[in-house]
């Protein structure tokens, strides 16, 4: 027979599951921050791209461990999430250099490591803010190791991957309209996994293989 529960019991069950999920997420975040701090040596210069709560946690954890380092943060247009992350990091006394996105190629040579987040990860690519592939290519050319930080629940078989190149609000880039003007405002793109030196997860630092 089908077991029935009262509305109150259902609410309590849902609340417990939510708390359990939140606790697991918090523990995963702490582990990722600790593992990620291992890839940053004292006096290193870290470049980031876009914004990631995990990358932010790693940098704050590294700062609290006593290591001295600086972070190069591209502004990440059009929503400027990089700028906002840099300001949050400064509040935690993490030294940051904020640059325009177009200056990434000029500053990548100064970095010892490139650290990014991920929105989704498939069997062969990592989905993140558009521009991630470009900065990864620059890092590879400069022999700068590239790491991505994400929880393992970000893995998603490619066949279930949402449309990556969906157009977003063109007014975020240009509010002027013209029949001859097409505004391309795409948020996400895929970067091959073999571009990366390693992945920082709650289970440790793993290689692309």
Give the location of each predicted region.
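N-terminal active-site beta-alpha-beta segment that forms phosphate/nucleotide-binding
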Residues: 1-99
